[in-house]
Amino acid sequence: MAVGIGIGLGRFPFETGRQYFDWVRYCEAAGIDSIWQTDRLVSKEPNLETLAAMAAIAGATSKIRFGMNVASIALRDPLITAKQCATIDRLSDGRLLPAFGIGSALSRDYL
């Protein structure tokens, strides 16, 4: 049995997009198994839109898996979200790890 290592990204701590992609490629080269992007549509801290980030990671890498650290399906059209996920998964050769939830009562973006 193997134990995988995943890294979660709750906000966008990088100064530039280039720094982000350098970090993503570093994670892949270092043998990290997966990158997880938190889904926050409203936040005081900078962060990326989850599905756009998944598509970007898919295009910048070839091995590492990636997923959303629970996308709020209550704020998204289910059919469009399913199609976006299917497209990203297909173009990444099955590396997308989708995760969905209804949101949190503790966060304004889920109201």
Regions found by a protein language model. Give the residues of each.
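Active-site nucleophile and cofactor-binding loops and adjacent substrate-binding regions
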Residues: 44, 68-76
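Conserved beta-strand positions in the central sheet of alpha/beta enzyme cores
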Residues: 36, 67, 97-99
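N-terminal beta1-alpha1-beta2 module of alpha/beta enzyme domains
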Residues: 1-61, 65
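Residue-level "edge-of-site" marker
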Residues: 40, 70-72, 102
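Glycine-rich, flexible loop/turn motifs
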Residues: 60, 66, 71, 87, ...
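Flexible, glycine-rich active-site loops centered on histidine and acidic residues
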Residues: 3-15, 75-111
